[in-house]
Every structure is written in structure tokens, then in C-alpha cells.
Amino acid sequence: MHMVGKRVRTRFAPSPTGYLHVGGLRTALYNYLFAKKMNGDFIIRIEDTDQSRKVEGAQQNLIKTLEWAGLVPDESPVHGGNFGPYLQSERLELYAGYCRQLLEDGTAYYCFATSEELEENRQLQMKQGLQPKYNRKWLPEDMGGSMPRSESEKMLASGAPYVIRMKVPDYVSVWFEDIIRGPIEFDSATIDDQVLMKSDGFPTYHFASVIDDHLMEFTHIIRGEEWLPSMPKHLLLYEFFGWEPPKYAHLPLLLNPDRSKLSKRQGDVAVEDYIQKGYSQEAIINFIALLGWNEGEGCEQEVYSMEQLIDRFSLERVGKAGSIFTIDKLNWLEKQYIKNRPAEKIIETIRPLLQEELSSKETMLDREVITGDDYLRQVIELMRERVGFEHEFVTFSSYFFFEPETWEEEAVKKRWTSDTPALLSEFLPTLEGLPEFTSDAIEAALKAFVEPKGLKAAVLIHPLRILASGVSFGPSLYHMLEVLGREAVLRRIRKGMECITVPA
């Protein structure tokens, strides 16, 4: 698999047509992991030869998203390198030179067919049950066609628009060994005379890609299986130029749970969408890595760091079958990372979010305290099992930072009885007088208060939770009260008792 004596070089070559697709991220990730595993180089090349589809700012967004994901290239349009330019639109003269070489060698020819003629020919072939391909009307006589060379020269002299096509040899088979799929063979009868240079002077993807892959000395091309049908054209171009092709690995499709091809119709496909929802870089990379690759039978590990992925990744362990994209798996991975992420790292994320919330809200809590490391660390340790995203430490735990203004109506109806205010009033001095306001002390005091009365702890636990947080769910009540602190808890109890009325 490794080309002996050559430094491994892989590439991710997106077109700047929009946001990075999750399928594109997987292709980039596998190229990155393989290159780093082999102590090689990972390169980004931008394939912008289709000017009609180019989107302003897309190139910058692609590179920014890849760097967010930790896939920092060794060479790119931004990072430079010895094999540039890394934008195909800046390499047009180079492609033109290689195209002239093929014209001189008799492996390419001028084609003056109009789009109307091509469409008419396509429709006719489809009616006949044939696979649509160019009918070679403009293939010169001296290349096995029927068009006199003089006709092409006449059209060229007149300034008529043209494309340049490759001449696919007749009656040959094109064969290669795919690292993932094994040997694959194509019959040249099924291969179209691919356009190499378009009428606007820009090369097609197929031509520019082969030229650049050779000149940039890539050893391995790792890409999606949608490119498999293009392989014979690419391999023939290598043959025309007398170049050794790189090794190829074609990755399986990404599928929706219903096994249809992953598409925006069934959910988000842009990496940017997942970033905005709050998924972490670690969880996304871990999830994407497992969409097609596994470490092997008997291995039950599912949570991997980037370092572990680099160490254990291999193209031989990438499957051929389509990989199911299940959001539940991504959510599960995110929770695993939150459970184990150092509090200090979570604080870096949530403190700016909290400051933003505080700027638009009033709070009775000490702002310096609730944005301080000690307080935030306590909230994180109490809530990390209950949140799915880092931002939920602020949104789902808002009662740690803001006084409740409302109290969950259904919970009040269910848990607040005519006896509740009297019990709370009687218990309040006990809370005020605790020598230490700790979870253990609060729990012991509450039990010591209710047991002599023949009551269960729940008669106070539920009302206290509603008063302290405004909601009926959350972490351990005793730990929550300890984190909030005596002053805030007593104030909330008194405020709530004034505002909550006994249900009729």
C-alpha cells in the first residue's frame, strides 16, 4: 500500500461551492489520518475550475472549518508549500500545455459539436437503450474517425467554439487495485470520450485533477465511491502521459437511517450546522471517523482521541458497504466527552455565553461569584451528567445564575398543598441556623424535621426544588442548594412563598 521510498502525500480537494459537507469532512479526515499515521503530508487543493458554481467566501469557510476540526494542512492556498499554486484557477497555462501535448500525441482531438447536437444524440441513444456517450462525429480520420482533419482546421480558423476530448482506445480493459475494494476492471466500450478542456478555456475536473495529482506528487488518492466511474478516464490519462498513477481508495457512501443517500432533505449535512448546534470538535471527529472505519473484530472501544485515531487508523479496516449516519450516536459521543472533559475547558466555553446572558438580564446573585471558576466548577460537576451540549450548562442550568421569575405550573399543582406554606415556614429557621450549609447537613436537617411528624421527605423536597429552581427536575436537591448557597436559597424560598398561591 505504501509506495516504497516515497514520502506519503494525501490531499483533500474540495470545490468552493458552499459549506463543507459531512461527507467531505470524512474524506478530509481519512486523508489526514492516513498521512499522519505514515508520517506524511496532508494537503488542501481548491478545485475551482467550474466558475459558474463558485461561491464567494466558500474557500475561506472550507479551510476555516477544517482547521476547527483539527485538520490543519501542511500545504494549502493559505499555508503555501513547494507544489503551488493550490488553486486550480491559477494553473490554467499549465493545463493548456499538457492538453497541447495530448493533441500532438494523437490522444485528444477538437470537438465542435453544439450543445443541441449533443442533446439530440443523447436522446437518440437513450431511445435505443444505449448508454449515452459522444458519437465521435468530430474524431479525425487519422485517429480512427470519419471527419477529415481539414474540417477541424477550417473550424479552428473560423474561430468556432470547441472543446477538447480525450480519445479512449477501443477494445481495451482498464484495471486497477483499490485499497478498500480490491481489483476493479472497466471495459473501454463503456467509457466516453471525456471533455478535457471546455470552450471557456478551463479544464474539466477529470483533466486538472490528474495533472495536479501527478505534479503535486500525491501517493494516495482517498475519495468517495462516487468517483469510481471516473477511474478509467483518469487511469487512461496517466497512461497517455506515461506517468505512474497513485494508489486509490474509494470510501463507502454515507447513508440516512433508511439507507437512502445522505442529503439535506432528511437533516443537516453541513458541518457548520453541527458546529452551530454546539457539537464539539472531539465528538464530531470521533463520530465521522467511525462512519466507515472500525478498529477490528473484538474491539469495543468507541471513544477515540485524535492521537488514538492517527495511531490506529488503516485503510484496510474501511468497509465497502454504505455507512449509516445516526444522530443518536453523535449525541451519545457528545455526552461521553462532556462527562470526561476537564471543568477548566468547559469554563472557557460557557463563561462568554454566561456573560452574554448576564448583559441582558438582571440577577440577584453576585455576578463576580457566579462567573468565577469555583462556582462554575461546582455547577459543571453537578450538571455534567444531565446536559448534552456545553451551552446547556447555561441554558438548562439557568437557575444557578438567575432568580426564578416563574414557577412550573404543573409542578405547583401536583406538589404544593395547603400544608406546604406552614411546613416551609417552620423549616426555614432550621436552614438559617445550620452551622454548615452543605448537602449532607441539609439532608440530615430535612429528615430530622419530617420524621417526628410522620411525614416523608418528599413533602419538602419537591416544594423546595420548585422554589429554588422554578422547575420540577434537576440534580440532587441537597447538592443544588449547597451550590446556590444559604443566602440565595433563603431569599428564593421567601420570594416564592409570597408569589405561589395554594391551588383551589
UniProtKB/Swiss-Prot annotation:
A motif ('KMSKS' region) lies at residues 261-265. Its EC number is 6.1.1.17. A motif ('HIGH' region) lies at residues 14-24. ATP binds at K264. This is Glutamate--tRNA ligase. It comes from the Bacteria. Keywords: Aminoacyl-tRNA synthetase, ATP-binding, Cytoplasm, Ligase, Nucleotide-binding, Protein biosynthesis. PROSITE patterns: AA_TRNA_LIGASE_I. The keyword Cytoplasm applies. Catalyzes the attachment of glutamate to tRNA(Glu) in a two-step reaction: glutamate is first activated by ATP to form Glu-AMP and then transferred to the acceptor end of tRNA(Glu). Coiled coil: none annotated. InterPro entries: aa-tRNA-synth_I_cd-bd, aa-tRNA-synth_I_codon-bd_sub2, aa-tRNA-synth_I_CS, aa_tRNA-synth_I_cd-bd_sf, Glu-tRNA-ligase_bac/mito, Glu/Gln-tRNA-synth, Glu/Gln-tRNA-synth_Ib_cat-dom, GluQ/Sye. GO terms for cellular component: cytoplasm. GO terms for biological process: glutamyl-tRNA aminoacylation. CDD domains: GluRS_core. One of its GO terms (molecular function) is glutamate-tRNA ligase activity. It catalyses: tRNA(Glu) + L-glutamate + ATP = L-glutamyl-tRNA(Glu) + AMP + diphosphate. The keyword DNA damage does not apply. It is found in: Cytoplasm. It comes from Chlorobium luteolum (strain DSM 273 / BCRC 81028 / 2530). Pfam families: Anticodon_2, tRNA-synt_1c. Belongs to the class-I aminoacyl-tRNA synthetase family. Glutamate--tRNA ligase type 1 subfamily. Monomer.
